[in-house]
């Protein structure tokens, strides 16, 4: 039995100054049974959605089960700002972790959406930082999931003129960019 030791910025709670709480996540080795269960779940779900999708499973260097989906009309699978893809990923994670001991992380992607979204968010962060510097007023972004908020925080963490923090409760939690004092 092999496992990968990983320090993650993922967090269920954030402390008052919004610094991410580091926690250790043990990723278990992905079993063939888990791969089969997740693959079957996705194929059945996508078939029920009336979609023709090819699924490619791979194990990332960090030990995550990475699943890339391809086919026509993948925009439907992505959904508004990736919400459908995120929901399907959540369900795939539940299926994977039901079928084995130890934690398995499942990452779903299609048409390189995750990388494109990350670039879009980094670009948005830089534009908002420029706007905050120019107008000298804080700017609150739209509500985002924890993964997307983390991208915004990371993109601006080395900016000497602005700071970021999150406000609100899930699912309406958003990043606020303010001028440093």
Predicted regions and their residues:
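RNA-contacting regions in translation and RNA-metabolism proteins
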Residues: 1-181
